[in-house]
Amino acid sequence: MSHKHALFNKVIAGLLAGLLTITAGGCSASDAQSLIDEARNYANSSQSSASQSSSSTSSGSDGTWSETDAPNYYKVTGKADFSAAGTMPSAGEIRYSELDSLGRAGMAVGVVTYQLMQSGSDRERDMPDTIAGWPEHNPKVEIVFSDGDKYHGYLFNRSHLIAKSLGGEDAERNMVTGTRTQNVGDNDATPGGMAYTESRARDWLRSHRNGTIEYMATPRYTGDELLPRTVDVDIRTSDGSIDEHVITYNTAAGFDIDYMNGGTK
């Protein structure tokens, strides 16, 4: 049964029950009309909420990447939207999702402060041995960028959802298996991939030590695939000077990523 039909049945059932109550109590026709109007308003508002929820869930999840549109493996698509997070954490705190049944990380959301950033930067790195989708063999590759530059090194990184340099922990629930380009783009003068928002956040906090940054990273998986096709990042500074929704693409030019199992095809 569709959501629309289920909602209709629910409203009608409530309406009939209410009318029976009104009839038994000998209430007026105006009371009955009031109940009908209330039911109609409920149906309209519920359908609107369901539509918004469906839209936010599917945003950016197909992972389609165009080198023309996103040569450095990220794309700014609008303003930040933290509605999926519900209540935001307190300043200086990060909230992580628990791993799902496939061992995959979910949404991570925090309110980053200068002190949290410093604590992450000062902390010793302690990376987990493996995460969901980590390949048995991580190939060394050459990736050619649109400007002709080349990267030589490992194809896959343990990519933080919220960077260690922003206070994010080195743990499975804060990491996805990402390509080198998803993690840092071409790693040149202009950071790309996840590094685009991470570098903007660090630079802003260094200039606004009493400010805060709302920051949320959401991996987007297709079905039971272990690797996300994209990671969506929402970032908003307390002064509003940065307010962006960013899609980072988990791919690499010239390679066919095996999103289901990890590695390449």
Residue ranges, per PLM feature:
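Bacterial signal peptide processing site
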Residues: S28-S30
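Bacterial N-terminal signal peptides that target proteins for export
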Residues: S2-A13
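Domain-level detector of nuclease and nuclease-like folds
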Residues: P89-K265
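C-terminal motif of bacterial Sec signal peptides marking the signal peptidase cleavage site
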Residues: I22-G26
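Intrinsic structural disorder/low-complexity segments
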Residues: A6-F8, A50, S55, A163
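N-terminal, intrinsically disordered, polar/charged segments of Gram-positive cell-envelope systems
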Residues: A32-A84
